[in-house]
Amino acid sequence: MANLKVIGVDPGTRSFDILGMVDGAPLLELSFPSEVVADNPSYIVDKMLEFSPDIIIAPSGYGVPLKRIDELTPKDRFCLTLELEKDKNRIPVLKGLQEMVDILKEKFPETYFIPSVILLPSVPEWRKFNKIDMGTADKLAIGVLAIYMESLRKNISYKDVSFVMVEIGYGYNAALLVKDGRIIDGIGGTLFPGPSFLSIGSMDAELAYLLQNFTKETLFRGGIKDIIGNINDIDEIEKNPHRGKAMLAFKEGILKAIYQLFSIYEPETIILSGRLTRNSFIINDLIDLIKNKTNKEIVILKGFAKKVKEAAQGSAIIGDGILGGKFKDIVDWTLIKEATGNVLSYIKIKNEANFY
């Protein structure tokens, strides 16, 4: 299809990014504070539709098997955000994302939703038991971008690409293991063995039990910001005299995630991506630590766009590939179209798992 126009998005904790591509080349790059999603989701939809796309890859949250918007079931909608009734409307951005889905369903039927890591057939079933978050749909998209960029950088085929990738974001950290060009394991933001800027990462189950009024908002707490206690943004970390132990927990968590994935397979390359990689104080120290501990090649994922974040680029790649464009081969190889099940499929605590 000539002049194939694709929209990919990154529904980040801090910003909502849009990438428009034509025949695989970036043409439109927009970034909005995430508050805009909460306050005016129709404005963002209108901006996407001004591009006259052939396909939009919508914010897919915890993911569903590849589906057009008119194929989504009520359970699929629940699985996008995993909000219980008691938490509805407590987090404005999540409310805005659900409203955006409603608007897209009405205005643009060629909207698609993509899977998260746990739904991929390349991840063995036994790694999925009693897990939900092995990497959200946006983390899968970043992984696809990383596979593509590594194949270019090394001039090799997708099937020869292997790496550990760590996404170091504002809200969450996450890690993926790629072997032979396919994602085979992942550690999502709510399973990560150390804090991100906002989030606690993995939580002691006894602590979860004691937090009787556990809400969705709790998942955005307990990170560097709360450990230090008197900062509001990433750039304030460097000058804060109380940062020391918080940053040790942050860096050790990233090392633990890398070695956790190394226990399955140990590639020679570690890729770092995400908002915090653009903070020189944080990333330079982290690269030195990882190099000294692992003796691996460290690569910062740059992508091919100038402004928007990696997940928007990866989701645009997926959209292009779905329609048989430039990136068809990488979408086919990564088995995105073969994703099955739902993010609750592998919960084995039967008597308790009445989520939906």
Residue positions per predicted region:
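Gly/Thr-rich phosphate-binding beta-strand-loop-beta motif of the actin/hexokinase/Hsp70
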Residues: A2-E29, V161-D185
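Glycine-rich phosphate-binding loop plus the immediately following alpha-helix
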Residues: I132-K159, Y170, D180-K239
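Short beta-strand-loop/turn "lid" adjacent to the catalytic site in phosphate-handling enzymes
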Residues: S52-K131
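Phosphate/pyrophosphate-binding loops at sites that engage ATP/ADP/AMP, CoA/4′-phosphopantetheine
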Residues: D46-I55, R153-S157, L255-I270
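Glycine-rich phosphate-binding loops at beta-strand->alpha-helix junctions
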Residues: S15, P267-L289
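Glycine-rich phosphate-binding/hydrolytic loop that grips phosphoryl groups
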Residues: N295-Y356
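Adenine-nucleotide phosphate-binding core of ATP-dependent small-molecule kinases
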Residues: E217-E268
